[in-house]
């Protein structure tokens, strides 16, 4: 069992913060070269001898085919479900993608193997849950922190909805696959991690002002993952084995923190709300969907600038009173300003994103300036969460 999983299980069982933590059912986590070689033995031990590999054409070529050969050589029955793109659009976690998987899955499957990046895992997570079967995560790119998550973000009728389903029972992160990932997906994973710069502040704000649940141990797990990425940005930018290992470890750590906590608060704040807002706009227009982490990284730049400038000034001069939330903003003014000071400067976030080839301007995402401004004004309404963006738009604008 990997040290990350041991640490997460220890936090889940020993933490005394008062918040009810989720017990982690996952019992195997392998990260390294040839990690996939541990898979056949694991499946035999569990009696899971009929598997369905879920992949797309690219991830099957990179990893799925090798996994299938390995398992067949050890007497395990393998069915392949290769998901296809919808015309000119990339594969999405939507009704079309889910329909392909439901139709293509073998009836006698004991376990699903998600061989791919975020979309493949989201589709496999919700389909396996609906079938009442477990699934195993085999990421092919260090692109998101949701590989270990219970949440499955699915697009339904053009709206992104997160369903709480199930986490994988095991994760095999093989560096032989991960080091082949396109640079854009590495940059996306790094952008997803940089998003914790603002999400951790929003989480503390929501706890302070609105008494939303908080856990110091989960906070420090997520903060450690973020710090590790920022301190090793050069290695990640080089896309060498050590850099990919560190980024993957950070993404897994962040995902386990969310799994323990039972909510996405640690890893998802206003920067993710902007990303979701843009994603739905791209869906409505039929435009090419930028990678999730690319949107999150750029949104983190915007939120940093907004919080450290406009929000700071509004809080410093805030004189409002009335509702419990407004009174709480006034009461915690100094603490709010201290939290804002912990956010990296927008220029520093930009420099880090540039180093890995991430999106640093709206044109990099084919994002209209008007949509950027619109998201800053409206994205806080997508989630019932007391982020600093929510406070700014709903209570501080007129102060």
Swiss-Prot record:
EC number: 1.1.1.261
Pfam families named in the record: Fe-ADH_2
Protein name as it appears in the record: Glycerol-1-phosphate dehydrogenase [NAD(P)+]
Quaternary assembly: Homodimer.
GO biological process terms, semicolon-separated: glycerophospholipid metabolic process; phospholipid biosynthetic process
InterPro entries found in the cross-reference section: G1P_dehydrogenase_bac, G1PDH, Glycerol_DH
Domain of life: Bacteria
Catalyzed reaction equations: sn-glycerol 1-phosphate + NAD(+) = dihydroxyacetone phosphate + NADH + H(+); sn-glycerol 1-phosphate + NADP(+) = dihydroxyacetone phosphate + NADPH + H(+)
GO cellular component: cytoplasm
Free-text function comment from the UniProt entry: Catalyzes the NAD(P)H-dependent reduction of dihydroxyacetonephosphate (DHAP or glycerone phosphate) to glycerol 1-phosphate (G1P). The G1P thus generated is probably used for the synthesis of phosphoglycerolipids in Gram-positive bacterial species.
Cofactor note: Binds 1 nickel ion per subunit.
Binding site for substrate: 145, 192, 276
Co-factor(s): Ni(2+)
Record keywords: Cytoplasm, Lipid biosynthesis, Lipid metabolism, Metal-binding, NAD, NADP, Nickel, Oxidoreductase, Phospholipid biosynthesis, Phospholipid metabolism
Primary enzyme class: oxidoreductase
GO molecular function: glycerol-1-phosphate dehydrogenase (NAD+) activity; glycerol-1-phosphate dehydrogenase (NADP+) activity; metal ion binding
Family to which this protein belongs: Belongs to the glycerol-1-phosphate dehydrogenase family.
Binding site for Ni(2+): 192, 272, 292
Record: residues binding NAD(+): 56, 118-122, 140-143, 149
Localization terms from the record: Cytoplasm
